Amino acid sequence: MARIAGVNIPNHKHAEIALTAIYGIGRSRAQKICDAAGVVRSAKIKDLTESDMEKLRDEVGRFVVEGDLRREVTMNIKRLMDLGCYRGVRHRRGLPLRGQRTRTNARTRKGPRKAIAGKK
């Protein structure tokens, strides 16, 4: 398995798909990386030369991916919580942020229902 940005890239997949194993790289960004590196999108990772892999590593290195991106997202959420703004309060309480209703639904964000004693 090849390693790019500290992630093992699957050998049996096409370059375009294999790059999506890296956190922060989706299909469209993977296509742009392949084009910029001059690598054929449909080429399997195991068939690429070491120079092709080096080009891919250089192109991926231009983006914020993996640990740095996770840290950045976490810090952004922490900043909102420290500010005490509406979105930060919703993060702190574990409720939806974007205006969804919470009287019913919102179970994914709120977690499983809490049993109410004496109900029935």
From Swiss-Prot:
The keyword Secreted does not apply. Residues 94-120 are annotated as: Disordered. GO terms for biological process: translation. Signal peptide: none annotated. Part of the 30S ribosomal subunit. Forms a loose heterodimer with protein S19. Forms two bridges to the 50S subunit in the 70S ribosome. Pfam families: Ribosomal_S13 (PF00416). This is Small ribosomal subunit protein uS13. Keywords: Ribonucleoprotein, Ribosomal protein, RNA-binding, rRNA-binding, tRNA-binding. PROSITE patterns: RIBOSOMAL_S13_1 (PS00646), RIBOSOMAL_S13_2 (PS50159). It comes from Azoarcus sp. (strain BH72). GO terms for cellular component: cytosol; small ribosomal subunit. Located at the top of the head of the 30S subunit, it contacts several helices of the 16S rRNA. In the 70S ribosome it contacts the 23S rRNA (bridge B1a) and protein L5 of the 50S subunit (bridge B1b), connecting the 2 subunits; these bridges are implicated in subunit movement. Contacts the tRNAs in the A and P-sites. Disulfide bonds: none annotated. GO terms for molecular function: rRNA binding; structural constituent of ribosome; tRNA binding. It comes from the Bacteria. Belongs to the universal ribosomal protein uS13 family. The keyword Magnesium does not apply. PANTHER family: 30S RIBOSOMAL PROTEIN S13/40S RIBOSOMAL PROTEIN S18, SMALL RIBOSOMAL SUBUNIT PROTEIN US13M.
